Amino acid sequence: MTEVGWWKLTFLRKKKSTPKVLYEIPDTYTQSEGGAEPPRPDSGNPNSNFNTRLEKIVDKNTKGKHVKVSNSGRFKEKKKVRASLAENPNLFDDREGKGQ
């Protein structure tokens, strides 16, 4: 009988337990007893909800100002550059008058 090498055991992934409930039934669907068809949003296009969510994600004016996408596709956080004392010489002048 052959034994499994120790190196094979290190690279095996354990199976994650699957959730008992794979999806949730929306409350609006359970409240409509007689209707065989689930209620739809006011717009006729089923992708309209998806499109509005996508616009919120892609909208560069409101969110993601502090994030930059590099050439490799990773998100890089833009860091604020602090003003130096050379640019603001009067920044700490009020401390000298207080005796500190």
Swiss-Prot record:
Domain of life: Eukaryota
Xref: Pfam families: ATAD4
Official protein name in the record: Proline-rich protein 15-like protein
Region (Disordered): 26-100
Family (UniProt): Belongs to the PRR15 family.
Gene for this chain: PRR15L
Composition skew (Basic and acidic residues), residue ranges: 53-62
Taxonomic source organism: Bos taurus (Bovine)
